[in-house]
Swiss-Prot record:
Family of this protein: Belongs to the AIR synthase family.
Catalysis: reaction(s): 2-formamido-N(1)-(5-O-phospho-beta-D-ribosyl)acetamidine + ATP = 5-amino-1-(5-phospho-beta-D-ribosyl)imidazole + ADP + phosphate + H(+)
Protein name, UniProt field: Phosphoribosylformylglycinamidine cyclo-ligase
Top-level taxon of origin: Bacteria
Species the sequence originates in: Rhodopirellula baltica (strain DSM 10527 / NCIMB 13988 / SH1)
Length: 359
C-alpha cells in the first residue's frame, strides 16, 4: 500500500486550512512600514519611513533582538483548553526584554510546534500573539507552524518568539549611568507572568488541588470568582506603553538610567544585570504588596522566602532606575499609561549587587 504524509500524521489539507486563518491576524498588526510581500519567503519592513504618522529617520540606528518562550505555563493552557492568552505571554516575554535597551519595537516572528494540526486551536493561539503585537506595537511579520506528531503528544504544543527593535545609539539605555541616589521604581505585574510554572504545577499537584478550584484567598478583590487556572493564566503584562511614556516626556539620558525585565531569577538576578561597578540596588520588600497568588503559593507549598524571590517576580514585572529628582514625576507618568508604579528601592554605593533591606 502506498504511503502518504497523512498516514504519517500530517494532513496537508488541514494544514492549508490552518494557514488560511492567519493572514487577517497578521494584517491587523501592520503599519505602513510593512512592505507587501504576498507569497514571499520573508517579511519586509522599512527602517526609515517618510510618512507623516509613522515618520522615522535614524541617524545611527542600532538593531536590538530578543527571543523567548512561555515555558510550562503552556501545560495549564493545554489541560484547560484555554489558548487565547498564551500568545500574549509569548510576545510579552520577548518585547519586554527588547525595551530594556530603550528600543522601539519593530516586528515579531513566531514559531508554533504542534503534535497534530488543529486549525481552530492554532487560530486561538495566534489570535493571542496578534493581540500581544497590537499591545506591544509590533508587526507580526511572519512565522512558522510545524506539525511534528513524533515529537509532541497529540494535544501538546510549544511556542517560541523572536522580536526585533531599533534604538538610536545616543539613546541606548544600558545601565552605565546608574549612580548612588537613583531611585528604583517597580512596575506592577499582573501575576505570575511566565516564570516559575514548574514549581507552581508541583505545588498544585502535591497538595491535591485542581485547576478548576476556586480559592477564596485569590478572590478577595475580584468581582467574578476566578479558578486557579484563570489566576495562573493571566497574561504577562506588556510594558511598551509605560516605557514609551517615559521616553516621550523626558530626556532619556537625564532621567532614565536603567531598565530590567523581572523574569526567572526575580528582582535580584535581573536587576543586578544592569548595575555598573561600585553600586548596589537596595530593595525594600515592604514597599509593595505582591499579588495574592504569591502568598498563597508560598504558604501552600511551604516555600522559603529566598526561594520565592529567586523563582518569581513577586509582583514586580519591570524595574526602572531613574534620577531621584524625577522619580515621583516618572511614577505618575507611568500610572497614566495604566501601570501601577511606585518606589521599591534606591541605588547606594556597593559592589554591583541587589540586596534586600529587611525590617
Amino acid at each position: 500500500m502506498a504511503s502518504t504524509y497523512k498516514d504519517a500524521g500530517v494532513d496537508l489539507d488541514v494544514y492549508a486550512e490552518s494557514m488560511s486563518r492567519l493572514p487577517r491576524l497578521m494584517h491587523r498588526t501592520f503599519s505602513p512600514r510593512v512592505m507587501p510581500s504576498d507569497g514571499g519567503f520573508a517579511g519586509l519592513f522599512r527602517l526609515d519611513f517618510p510618512g507623516k504618522l509613522f515618520a522615522r529617520n535614524y541617524e545611527e540606528p542600532v538593531l536590538v533582538s530578543g527571543t523567548d518562550g512561555v515555558g510550562t505555563k503552556l501545560k495549564i493552557a493545554q489541560t484547560m483548553n484555554q489558548h487565547e492568552t498564551v500568545g500574549i505571554d509569548l510576545v510579552a516575554m520577548c518585547v519586554n526584554d527588547l525595551i530594556c535597551t530603550g528600543a522601539e519595537p519593530l516586528f515579531f516572528l513566531d514559531y508554533v510546534a504542534m503534535g497534530r494540526d488543529d486549525p481552530a486551536r492554532l487560530e486561538r493561539i495566534v489570535q493571542g500573539i496578534s493581540d500581544g503585537c497590537v499591545d506591544g506595537d509590533l508587526a507580526l511579520l511572519g512565522g512558522e507552524t510545524a506539525i511534528m506528531p513524533d515529537m509532541y503528544g497529540t494535544d501538546d504544543y510549544d511556542l517560541a518568539g523572536f522580536a526585533v527593535g531599533v534604538v538610536e545609539r545616543k539613546r541606548l539605555v544600558d545601565g552605565h549611568l546608574i549612580a548612588p541616589g537613583d531611585v528604583v521604581l517597580g512596575l506592577q505585574a499582573s501575576g505570575l507572568h511566565s516564570n516559575g510554572f514548574s514549581l507552581v504545577r508541583k505545588i498544585i499537584a502535591d497538595h491535591g488541588h485542581q485547576w478548576s478550584d476556586v480559592i477564596d484567598e485569590l478572590n478577595q478583590d475580584t468581582k467574578t470568582p476566578e479558578t486557579l487556572a484563570q489566576v495562573c493564566l493571566r497574561p504577562t503584562k506588556i510594558y511598551v506603553s509605560a516605557i514609551r511614556s517615559i521616553q516621550s516626556h523626558y530626556r532619556v539620558k537625564q532621567v532614565l538610567h536603567g531598565i530590567a525585565h523581572i523574569t526567572g531569577g526575580g528582582i535580584e538576578e535581573n536587576l543586578d544585570r544592569i548595575l555598573p561597578p561600585g553600586v548596589n540596588a537596595e530593595i525594600d520588600p515592604n514597599a509593595w504588596t505582591p499579588n495574592p497568588i504569591f502568598q498563597w503559593l508560598q504558604q501552600t507549598g511551604d516555600v522559603a522566602t529566598s526561594e520565592m524571590r529567586r523563582v518569581f517576580n513577586m509582583g514586580i514585572g519591570m524595574a526602572v532606575v531613574v534620577n531621584e529628582y524625577y522619580a515621583a514625576s516618572v511614577a505618575s507618568q507611568v500610572a497614566k499609561a495604566g501601570i501601577e508604579c511606585s518606589p521599591i528601592g534606591r541605588i547606594v554605593e556597593g559592589s554591583s549587587k541587589v540586596v534586600y533591606k529587611e525590617a
